[in-house]
Regions:
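A short glycine-rich beta-alpha junction/loop motif
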Residues: 73, 87-94, 124-147
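Sequence-specific dsDNA recognition surfaces
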Residues: 5-23, 36-65, 84, 89
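Short helix/loop capping segments that flank catalytic or ligand/cofactor-binding pockets
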Residues: 41-43, 80, 105
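Short, positively charged
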Residues: 99-138
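Short, charged beta-turn/beta-strand-edge "cap" motif at the junction between a beta-strand
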Residues: 75-78
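ATP-grasp fold ATP-binding core
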Residues: 33
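Non-catalytic DNA-recognition/assembly elements of restriction-modification systems
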Residues: 1-15, 27, 137, 141-181
Length: 181
C-alpha cells in the first residue's frame, strides 16, 4: 500500500483567474476546466479557455496530458477524470501527475473503483468537499507488474470518447442547419 501522494510524481490544485479581467478570458486558447466537467471520463475539450496572460499572472497551472483529476467540492466531489489534453483547472480540482502512462492508467481505474467510498468521506455543511490533503493521504495498492492491459483499455476509452465528441459536434452542426431551413 502507498499513499496517492507517494505514488504520484506531483499533485496540484488549480485556480480561477479573475473574471473581472477580460484580458484573462477574451480569445483564450488554453483549456480551463471546471469541476462540473469531471464526470468519470476522459476529457478532450473544455467549456472555457484562458489566455497566456492569465496563466503567467495567476496561480493556475498547466497540467500535462495524462493527468488524473478528482473533483473536490459539491455534487461532483470524488468524480475522476483523465486529461486527454494539456489544461488548467479551477481550485475545485486536484490534479495528480503520475510518473508514466502505466501508473496513470492504474490510478484512474483504482479511483474509479473506489469513487463511492472516497466521495462518501467528503465533509462540510452546505457543500461537502474533499481536501487536497485528504486525497494525498488515500492509500492505494501499488501495481506489482506493468499495467499495459489497463493502458490499452484507457487508450480505447480515449479514442472512443474523442469520437463521441466529434459526433456530438457534427450532430450540433446538422441540427443547426436543419433548424435554419
Amino acid at each position: 500500500m502507498v499513499t496517492i501522494k507517494d505514488f504520484c510524481a506531483e499533485m496540484k490544485s488549480g485556480a480561477t483567474p479573475s473574471r473581472s479581467n477580460p484580458e484573462y478570458w477574451s480569445n483564450g486558447t488554453i483549456p480551463w476546466l471546471k469541476s462540473g466537467e469531471v464526470h468519470n471520463n476522459v476529457i478532450h475539450h473544455t467549456e472555457e479557455h484562458i489566455t497566456g496572460e492569465a496563466l503567467s499572472e495567476c496561480s493556475t497551472k498547466l497540467l500535462p496530458y495524462g493527468t488524473i483529476l478528482m473533483a473536490m467540492y459539491g455534487v461532483t466531489a470524488g468524480e475522476v477524470g483523465y486529461l486527454g489534453l494539456p489544461a488548467t483547472t479551477n481550485q475545485a480540482i486536484c490534479g495528480m501527475i503520475c510518473k508514466n502512462k502505466s501508473d496513470a492508467s492504474w490510478l484512474f481505474f483504482t479511483l474509479l473503483a473506489f469513487q463511492k467510498d472516497i466521495s462518501s468521506q467528503a465533509t462540510g455543511g452546505a457543500q461537502s468537499n474533499l481536501s487536497k490533503e485528504f486525497i494525498e493521504r488515500i492509500h492505494i495498492l501499488r501495481p506489482q507488474r506493468n499495467c499495459s492491459d489497463l493502458e490499452k483499455i484507457l487508450h480505447h476509452i480515449e479514442t472512443n470518447s474523442a469520437e463521441i465528441n466529434k459526433l456530438k459536434t457534427l450532430q450540433d452542426l446538422l441540427l443547426a442547419k436543419i433548424s435554419s431551413r
